[in-house]
Amino acid sequence: APPGNDGVSPQEARWRLSQLLGPNAEARPQQADYASAVSQAFQPREAEDSPNLVLAEAGTGVGKTLGYVAPASVWAQKNQGPVWLSTFTRNLQHQIDTELDRLFPEMRDKQRKVVVRKGRENYLCLLNYEEAVRGLQVRSQDALAVGLMARWTARTRDGDMVGGDFPGWLPDLVGRGRTLGLTDRRGECIYAACPHYRKCFIEGSIRRARRAEIVVANHALVMIQAALGGGDEGTIPPRTVFDEGHHVFDAADSAFSAHLSGRETVELRRWLLGAEGGSRSSSRIRGLKRRVEDLLGDDPEVPEALDETLRAARCLPADGWHGRLTEDAAAGPAERFLASVRQQVYARVTRPGDPYSLETELRPAIQPLVDGAAELDTALEALYRPMKRLHDGLHARLDAEAEDLDSDTRRRIEATCRSLNRRGLMQVGAWRNMLQAAQDAAGPDAFVDWLMVERADGRDIDVGLHRHWVDPTQPFAQFVAQPSQGMVITSATLTDGSGDR
C-alpha cells in the first residue's frame, strides 16, 4: 500500500528531537528551531508537481542530522512509508547510520527499519564468490583470501564492501582480485536467473528498502533512480532529505550527463553479445541471447527481434578497438566515429604531448567527424528499432500471460525489460541525439558538448563525445523534485555570501 499523507507538526518534530537527545542533553535552541522548520517538508502536498520544498542552511555544530531525522522518523512511522536521507560522501552516510542508533537502540529493530543503499558496485556478488571457490581447484594460492572472505560473508550486516563493515586492510593483505574484485560488476547481474538471487545482498537491500522507515543513500543513487523512473526500486521516494546540499547540483550534473565513448560502447557490445573471440572474461558475460532465450515466449517476432538486435550490435567497437584507432585501422561505424573524434582533438589542442586528458570543442567539426556521426547514427537506429521490439514483446508477455507466469520468470522478464530500457534504449537514444546535433553547425542551447581523449600516465585510455546540461537544475527539477511529495535540501554552505554586508 502507498504511504499515508499525515503531516508532521513543528511540535511533533521538537518532541521527537528531545526523545533522541535524551534528558541530559545540552539545550540547543537552534537545533530545535531547525527541526521545526524542516518539518514543513513533511506536510501533505497540495498540488501536483509542487513538492513541499525546504532549503535549510545551518552552520556546523547546530546538529542538522538529528534535526532532520526527528521529523523524518515521525513521518515514516505515521504514514508507513520510507524517508530517504541522501548524502554526498560515504563518511556522512556512515555518520547518519551511527546516529540512527539513537532512534533504534535495539539492533534487531534497526536492521529491519534502517537500510543503507549504495550502487551495485559496492556489494559482494555471491555468484562471483561461488566462481572464486570453484577456481580454487586450479588456483590453490587463493585459498586464504577465499577463506577469509567466507568468514566475513557469514557475518556481514549487508555485504557492503566499500565503506561498510568490510575490513579495509584485507585487500592489501591478500590482493584485490579475490576481495574487492568480487563486487557486482557493471552489466553482469543475471537477476532471478542467479541461484543466489533470494540471498543476494543487493536484492535484499532493495527489498528491505521498500519496507524500511529510513533509507540512507547517496546523491548519485537517488539521482539515477529518479532518472530511471524508480530504477530497481520501481518507485520514487515520497520524501527525501539531501544533506550536503551544496553538492546536489554536481551530482545532478553527473547523473544526467551522457557519454558516447569507446569504453561505453564496448560495454554495451559486451552486454549484448557477451565475451567474444576466446576472451578470458568471466563466463557470466554471456550475452543477451543466453540470458533471455528461455523468456521469449511463443511470439515468433520476439526471437527475430533478438537476432536483429545482436546483428546490429556489431556496429559497436570490439575488443582491441583502441589499438586499431591509434594504427588508423578503425573497423565499423563506431570505431570510425571515435577515430574522427581523436583526430579532431589532436588537431585542435595546443599541447598534445601533455600527460593529462585532452579536451576540445565539438564545433566547428571536421568533415570526417560529421560524416562519421551520420554513419553511426544510421547504425544505431538499426540497433534501436529491433531492441525496442524486443523490449515491447517481452513486456507484452507479462500482460498476456499474467495468470500463467511463475514469480521467478516474471521477475526475470521485468528485470530484462528494465535493463533493455536503461542500458539499451535510453543510452542509444541519447547517443543518437548527440550524433544528430554533431552534424549541425549550432548545437542545442540546453547542452554543452565537447570531445575528449582521456589519459592515464600519459597514455590514451578512452576517446569520446560528452554532453552535460548547461543548467543541471532543469533535469533535477523535472525528474527528482516534481515527483516528490516533500524534499529538504540542507547544508552548512547553501548560500555564497553575496548578500552579506
For each predicted feature, which ranges?
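"flanking P-loop NTPase cores in genome-maintenance ATPases
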Residues: F249-V428, R432
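Walker A/P-loop
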Residues: A47-P71
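A substrate-engagement module of RecA-like helicase motors
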Residues: A1-S18, D49, T60, N79-E213, ...
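Conserved two-lobed SF2 helicase motor
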Residues: R211-I224
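Conserved pre-motif I regulatory segment
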Residues: P3-A56
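A contiguous, basic/glycine-rich beta-loop/short-helix subdomain that forms a polymer-engagement track
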Residues: L180, R185-R210, A226-G231, L383, ...
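SF2 helicase catalytic motif II
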Residues: T235-F256
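Walker A/P-loop NTP-binding motif
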Residues: S39-Q43, T65-N79, L100-L103
